[in-house]
């Protein structure tokens, strides 16, 4: 709060969960922070759907603050959250705020260019290429490029437009390194992907191992 220069934080999100800490311990601490006026609302981030369900049951049973947002791993080339987490959030009226909506750049630049960047370096721990490629990612990347050319926009804007129009997503968390990229992200709100565009982007996707929970 001091760094932000505010008395109350509107939305305080926990960074994943500690499996060794009982849900009620964290939720009681957040409830206390809310009652003392330090936070208004609380959310959480990447976990299994059963873990979120346990958190929600604990809140109801113990009359504690309940999570209102989920910050999860979700983008056009990684959609495993559609299995359980997103339907759960929809049923419980929990806002979805995906982190990494551009998949560390995977759907934001031509596939061949990924290998020529630091993020595409096989020695880079955060190299997303092998993870997303095995789920039909290469073809998804190529289709993002095609639609970007058709719409006269960047690949990143198509990837964001897919997020903006997604029925589950409330507000993707977009990280930028320049004002230009921030402006592009805002401009992507004006892109109207047709139903056939969305189907074209989603059709190559194949289920893949869940990543991003640890």
List each language-model region with its residue ranges.
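Active-site groove signature of glycoside hydrolases
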Residues: 1-22
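Beta/alpha (TIM)-barrel catalytic core signal, keyed to glycine-rich beta->alpha loops juxtaposed to Asp/Glu
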Residues: 21-203
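A short beta-strand-loop micro-motif that forms or neighbors metal/cofactor-
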Residues: 205-208
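Acidic/histidine-enriched, glycine/proline-rich intrinsically disordered or flexible terminal extensions
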Residues: 212-214
